[in-house]
Amino acid sequence: MKVDTKEVNPAFQSIIQNPGQKVFLDANFFIPPDRSEVAKVRAYSFTDFKECWLIPLLSEFTGLAIHESVYDEFVADSVKEYADEQTSCIPSKLRIHYDSELSGLEEALRNTYINKIAVHSLYNPTRDNAKDRGEVRSLSFMAVKQFLYFAANDALPVRLIKDAAKLLTGLDDMQ
């Protein structure tokens, strides 16, 4: 991974300066890294991952959110249970956004975004397959609601946002 130490990322700087801004997270933010097969090391437990990553993250940044399609990607019960705890605590530390929140006009707009974005992914809206569904549906929802920030450790959403003008995804204002 290449890290630019000369230029400050304006989106990151904005979020650090105002940690209450709405930031959508991809599922990979909630899944412990597992390099046990590659490096012959013990897999990172969810308990340890939660302690050193999720608790500090959700404590410091109060505007964190996920789309329902990302929530559906959580396979491990421990991850879903933790997300449920964070959405139901007072004050809530995580918000789940649902497509049911959209008006009829917003649904039509979301479908347009889905079709524009899906052609650059492995997601097929007709089949509603799992591959890239979370990213495509999250970004589409965000575009309709004009949310700016999506955090992921995945090349697809980064490319869809960074190259929005060239790919004609309609995500030009996102970071």
Task: Give residue ranges: language-model regions.
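Conserved SAM-binding loop
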Residues: F150-A151
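Active-site-proximal, substrate-binding regions of enzyme catalytic domains
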Residues: K2-Q146, A155-Q175
